[in-house]
């Protein structure tokens, strides 16, 4: 399985049918203890602060290009990857990742509708084994239209 075309908002049942596609990367932005207890099979964990700049007094801006490229590469994102993001807090963290990807020039992404709670409540499979991502090479190519 290699070709994957998912909508911007993906339903849990659609995502479950898509597990196993070569270019799919599921990114969990839940709290670390939640990830250790349960996550979608194959999902890599990303700590939310890694996609935020930490320069005082401007906390929360985008990290610099080199940092952003390193972080996204380290979790397995390249230009061919379709990212599905979710969290356990209403989608804010996952949505921030998708906006960050858009700003960085990567438009292949989806948000899991309802996040981890919808996935679990609908009885889809869960895992507690950590996933080690395959490192890829991500290059930031600014999409100036995406800046707020």
Q: Model-flagged regions — what are they?
A:
Residues 2-80:
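Positively charged, proline/Ser/Thr-rich regional signature most characteristic
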Residues 3-4, 60-148:
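Thiolate-centered catalytic microenvironments shared by cysteine-dependent enzyme domains
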């Amino acid at each position: 399985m290699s070709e994957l075309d998912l909508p911007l908002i993906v339903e849990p049942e659609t995502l479950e049918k898509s597990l196993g596609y070569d270019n799919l990367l599921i990114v969990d932005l839940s709290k670390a203890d939640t990830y250790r207890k349960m996550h979608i099979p194959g999902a890599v964990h990303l700590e939310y602060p890694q996609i935020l700049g930490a320069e005082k007094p401007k906390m929360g801006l985008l990290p610099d290009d080199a940092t952003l490229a390193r972080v996204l590469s380290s979790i397995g994102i390249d230009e061919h990857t379709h990212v599905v993001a979710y969290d356990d807090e209403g989608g804010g963290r996952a949505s921030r990742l998708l906006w960050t990807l858009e700003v960085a020039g990567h438009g292949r992404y989806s948000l899991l509708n309802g996040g981890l709670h919808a996935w679990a409540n609908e009885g889809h499979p869960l895992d507690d084994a950590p996933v080690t991502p395959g490192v890829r090479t991500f290059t930031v190519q600014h999409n100036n239209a995406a800046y707020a």
